[in-house]
Structure formats: structure tokens, C-alpha cells
């Protein structure tokens, strides 16, 4: 899948789940399952409930995504 095919949206982390997964509520009200991208994991960036994040969604499965940025 090419990088241009992703959909970037903003959301808020609702709850942490096992294996670096998070339940994220998007701005439009949908709740999705998101995992942490490799760069965030490599740099040990902590993501807590209530954090505002940017999520990349695949056009093929809109219920799962990848957290690419955590706002300060």
C-alpha cells in the first residue's frame, strides 16, 4: 500500500489495551482500534488516556489505524 492511500484523522485516546493497542475516539465520533507506529515505539513516547493523537487509517479497513503523532 502506498503512503498516499492513507486517511489521516485526529482523535482522543479513550483506553489503553494490551500489546500497545489503544481505543481511539475520532473527531467524528467513531471509535477505532489503533496501534503505535514504529517511530513512536522506538522513541519511547508514552501515550495515555486523554491524549490527542493523529491516526492513519487504511481505506480498506476503517476500524483499525496507526497512531503516528501525539500532540503535546
UniProtKB/Swiss-Prot annotation:
Disulfide bonds: none annotated. It holds the Pfam family eIF-1a. One of the essential components for the initiation of protein synthesis. Stabilizes the binding of IF-2 and IF-3 on the 30S subunit to which N-formylmethionyl-tRNA(fMet) subsequently binds. Helps modulate mRNA selection, yielding the 30S pre-initiation complex (PIC). Upon addition of the 50S ribosomal subunit IF-1, IF-2 and IF-3 are released leaving the mature 70S translation initiation complex. Transmembrane segments: none annotated. Component of the 30S ribosomal translation pre-initiation complex which assembles on the 30S ribosome in the order IF-2 and IF-3, IF-1 and N-formylmethionyl-tRNA(fMet); mRNA recruitment can occur at any time during PIC assembly. Belongs to the IF-1 family. The modification Phosphotyrosine is found at residue 60. GO terms for cellular component: cytosol. The gene is infA. GO terms for molecular function: ribosome binding; rRNA binding; translation initiation factor activity. Residues 1-72 form the S1-like domain. The lineage of its organism: Bacteria, Bacillati, Bacillota, Bacilli, Bacillales. It is found in: Cytoplasm. This is Translation initiation factor IF-1. Keywords: Cytoplasm, Initiation factor, Phosphoprotein, Protein biosynthesis, RNA-binding, rRNA-binding. Its main location: cytoplasm. CDD domains: S1_IF1 (cd04451).
Amino acid at each position: 500500500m502506498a503512503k498516499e492511500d492513507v486517511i489521516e484523522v485526529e482523535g482522543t485516546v479513550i483506553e489503553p489495551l494490551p500489546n500497545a493497542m489503544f481505543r481511539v475516539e475520532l473527531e467524528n465520533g467513531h471509535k477505532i482500534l489503533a496501534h503505535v507506529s514504529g517511530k513512536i515505539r522506538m522513541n519511547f513516547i508514552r501515550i495515555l488516556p486523554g491524549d490527542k493523537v493523529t491516526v492513519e487509517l487504511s481505506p480498506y479497513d476503517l476500524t483499525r489505524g496507526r497512531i503516528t503523532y501525539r500532540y503535546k
